[in-house]
Structure formats: C-alpha cells, structure tokens
Amino acid sequence: MTRSAKKGPFCDAHLLKKVEAAVGGKDKKPIKTWSRRSTIMPEFIGLTIAVHNGRQHVPVYVTENMVGHKLGEFALTRTFKGHAADKKAKR
C-alpha cells in the first residue's frame, strides 16, 4: 500500500535542516545521512546526498526524475555475485 495523499511526503527533520543549510551556503560537499526512508523533495535537486547502505555511504546526485522516490532506492544494500554455475554443463 502506498502512503495516504492527505498525509503528504515524509522527510526526516534533521535531513531537511542539512539540505537548507547546504542550499543557503552553496556548499558542494555531500550531505551524509542514514535516513533511507526520506522522500526526495524538489529542494534536493542538484545536491549530492551520501546515503548509507549498511556498510558505507553511497553518493547519490539528485535529479528531477528522482523527486517523489525514497533515498534508499538509489543506494543498493545487496551485491549480486551471480548464480552458481551448473555442474552438468561443465562436463
């Protein structure tokens, strides 16, 4: 189920403060956050946000197409190494 339209998008308050400071100060340094659940707002466009994936912070450059999505969608948590080789095919 999706979030109710009357509630509006969710974004952590501490992340919004960091974004407002970065926009006001014209700072190009990535904003480090652990808030994967926050929705990307139009104010984030043009900023680089370092989203934590459980091991490290992945830099995500925010574009117009990303508005409305969650930050966690762009920082993958699992690394796919490929399926195991078929033993019958090797013979």
Swiss-Prot record:
Keywords: Ribonucleoprotein, Ribosomal protein, RNA-binding, rRNA-binding. InterPro entries: Ribosomal_uS19, Ribosomal_uS19_bac-type, Ribosomal_uS19_CS, Ribosomal_uS19_SF. GO terms for cellular component: cytoplasm; small ribosomal subunit. PROSITE patterns: RIBOSOMAL_S19. Pfam families: Ribosomal_S19. It comes from the Bacteria. Belongs to the universal ribosomal protein uS19 family. Protein S19 forms a complex with S13 that binds strongly to the 16S ribosomal RNA. HAMAP family: Ribosomal_uS19. This is Small ribosomal subunit protein uS19. It comes from Cupriavidus pinatubonensis (strain JMP 134 / LMG 1197) (Cupriavidus necator (strain JMP 134)). The lineage of its organism: Bacteria, Pseudomonadati, Pseudomonadota, Betaproteobacteria, Burkholderiales. The gene is rpsS.
